[in-house]
A protein has these predicted regions:
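Loop-helix junctions at membrane interfaces
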Residues: 1-201
């Protein structure tokens, strides 16, 4: 019972951190023109590793819902891909917007947790294995977010996303790849570093 209460308390703290990061300007979301860079996946990853995959999925859900709410309340030019309630320049969100905003974020903690556990099992007893496991889990969680979100945008909103961001439709996947390489990989590396540094403390 004590562990359950502790886990619920920690989940509450992580929830508060995620909400605060989503609300405070430049803390969780960094505006980059037609996209936002984010580090909100970091508390989702850390929470999943500490509390397990169910709590990881819950924290990812919180992240996803805050993403949808932010896209609705303070929309940017491509916010329709994250909110079914937004219309920007004739381009509207739909149910797939909610899927893109929420499902990848739910997957972040689940993937990070199982990657961490797998590495710890395979590298059991090897010096430094926990550091490696935390770092790789952080990267895996970050890349899960980026790959699922950006490919979801391409599949469900390719044409309207291209038009809203002033890109040619035939080159839109090049733009998606550019975002994955230019923002997704650095975000994932930062997630790996922060996950390792914070969780080991």
């Amino acid at each position: 019972i004590e562990k359950k209460v502790l886990d619920m308390s920690l989940a509450g703290i992580f929830t508060a951190i995620i909400i605060a990061m989503s609300v405070v300007p430049f803390l969780g979301y960094i505006p980059l023109g037609f996209m936002n860079a984010t580090i909100i996946h970091v508390p989702v990853i850390i929470g999943a590793i500490i509390l397990g995959p169910k709590y990881g999925a819950y924290l990812g859900l919180v992240f996803g819902v805050t993403s949808l709410v932010k896209a609705t309340i303070t929309p940017g030019v491509t916010s329709f891909v994250f909110s079914p309630f937004v219309t920007i320049g004739g381009y509207s969100g739909n149910m797939w917007s909610a899927v893109i905003a929420i499902v990848p974020r739910v997957c972040i903690g689940i993937v990070a947790y199982y990657v961490y556990k797998l590495i710890m099992k395979v590298a059991h007893g090897i010096k430094g294995s926990q550091t490696v496991a935390l770092w790789v889990a952080g990267i895996a969680g970050g890349m899960t977010n980026t790959l699922l979100v950006m490919n979801g945008i391409y599949i469900f909103f390719g044409q309207s996303y291209a038009a809203a961001s002033n890109k040619a439709v035939e080159h839109i996947y090049d733009v998606i790849l550019g975002i994955i390489l230019g923002f997704g990989i650095p975000e994932a590396i930062v997630a790996g570093i922060l996950t390792t540094a914070i969780t080991k403390v």
